[in-house]
């Protein structure tokens, strides 16, 4: 049977240190899972650029720091196949600003509310055995994105709904072409709840959280 795990990460190094989700923790979780394949939140074009030049980090849309510092080297050292699954179109991304179309004053108010949602998410860090991989975090995240949908349904659809649909479909395609393998999805923790809700319906053994 195909085994699929989900590991939600925090991209910001300072926040990782503050909330006890270090790269060392991520490394131990990946090593415990023993993946044959890692499906990571990296754009396919960014992955191609990395393959051509492993020092090319200056373009917009580059992978988050945990990929450069941990995941890519770990894959290379342990012969783990890496599959990039992220999706976005940089030329139109800013056209779907969730606070676009609002006055400057209202944008500032919305940004403040968005910041409050972030702090609510961070407040769940001690729930579960892995920071930000818990029912409590996922529920707070779901509520945050329901609010963003109310603010701007069009932007939410492109930046969140469609993006996650494509990311998850790339995982499904990887599952279909690699039966009976151990596949680890590594994504920003905000994506956890959508990945879990969708992949639980597949004929696989889904592991989330990993501990």
Where do the protein language model's features map onto the residues?
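Short, solvent-exposed loop/turn segments at secondary-structure junctions
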Residues: 11-13, 43-48, 88-91, 189-193
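Extreme N-terminal starter segment of soluble prokaryotic enzymes
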Residues: 1-5
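Acidic/histidine-rich helix-loop elements
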Residues: 7-21
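Short, flexible loop segments at boundaries between secondary-structure elements
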Residues: 149, 153, 192, 200-211
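Conserved, well-ordered alpha-helix/loop/beta-strand core segments that scaffold catalytic motifs
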Residues: 174-183, 189-194
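Proline-aspartate-enriched helix->loop->beta-strand connector
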Residues: 34-40
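Active-site charged/polar residues at nucleotide-handling catalytic sites that mediate phosphoryl
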Residues: 32-33, 178
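Hydrophobic, often amphipathic alpha-helical segments used for membrane interaction and targeting
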Residues: 46, 51-178, 198
């Amino acid at each position: 049977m195909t085994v699929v795990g989900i590991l939600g990460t925090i991209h910001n190094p300072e926040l990782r240190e503050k909330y006890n989700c270090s790269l060392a923790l991520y490394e131990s979780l990946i090593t415990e899972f023993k993946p044959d394949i890692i499906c990571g939140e990296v754009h396919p074009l960014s992955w191609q650029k990395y393959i051509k030049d492993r020092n090319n980090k200056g373009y917009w849309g580059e992978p988050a720091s945990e990929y450069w510092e941990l995941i890519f080297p770990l894959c290379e050292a342990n012969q783990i196949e890496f599959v990039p699954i992220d999706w976005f179109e940089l030329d139109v991304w800013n056209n779907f600003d969730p606070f676009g179309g609002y006055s400057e004053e209202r944008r500032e108010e919305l940004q403040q509310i968005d910041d409050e949602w972030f702090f609510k998410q961070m407040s769940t860090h001690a729930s579960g055995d892995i920071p930000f991989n818990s029912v409590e975090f996922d529920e707070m995240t779901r509520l945050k994105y329901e609010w963003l949908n109310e603010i701007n349904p069009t932007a939410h659809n492109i930046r969140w709904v469609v993006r996650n649909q494509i990311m998850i479909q790339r995982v499904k395609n990887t599952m279909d072409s690699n039966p009976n393998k151990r596949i680890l999805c590594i994504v920003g923790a905000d994506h956890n709840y959508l990945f879990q809700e969708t992949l639980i319906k597949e004929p696989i053994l889904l592991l989330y959280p990993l501990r």
